[in-house]
Amino acid sequence: MTLPQSPLLVELKNLSFGYGDRVILNDLSFGIPRGKVTALMGVSGGGKTTVLRLIGGQYTAQKGQLTFDGQDVGQMNVEQLYAARRRMGMLFQFGALFTDLSVFDNVAFPLREHTDLSESMIRDIVLMKLEAVGLRGARDLMPSEISGGMARRVALAR
């Protein structure tokens, strides 16, 4: 018998984290729904990056529970963390694009690195993603040639 999938892909329950005596997160609880784009917003220094590093397994919570697809992130081994990270996407405030790659190649990069897809399949997927974010016509441009808003859309497509 298979257990039903939780509607939450990521769940934090009563999570606490800090550096020495400095508390960064105290008793934080929330969930990220499966298949949804979710924004994490807050004041500067409020712990947003720390939360993302906890979810990605770079940090370990001092208290509470953090699960990704039902698995305790703190108990994952290296291979399980890599597998989980391949299923995550993070969009940074300034795009984090490779400055020496075109828009097309920035979007193609993770497909080339993490899949065995043919170049023709990668091309089709990249063009579909660029179309979805309204940037198909910008495929040959370099990051220095596009606006900040366009760079964020390229990062989203990636």
Task: Give a label for each model feature.
Residues M41-V43:
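The feature captures the beta-strand-to-loop junction immediately N-terminal to the Walker
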Residues D100, M142-I146, M150:
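Conserved ABC ATPase signature
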Residues Q71-D72, T115, E119-A138:
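Conserved ABC ATPase "signature" region
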Residues V73-G89, E113, E119-S120:
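ABC ATPase NBD coupling module
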Residues G56:
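Helix-to-loop junction immediately C-terminal to a conserved catalytic motif
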Residues D100-P110:
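Short coil-to-helix segment of the ABC ATPase nucleotide-binding domain corresponding to the Q-loop/switch region
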Residues G64-D72:
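Conserved ABC transporter NBD signature motif
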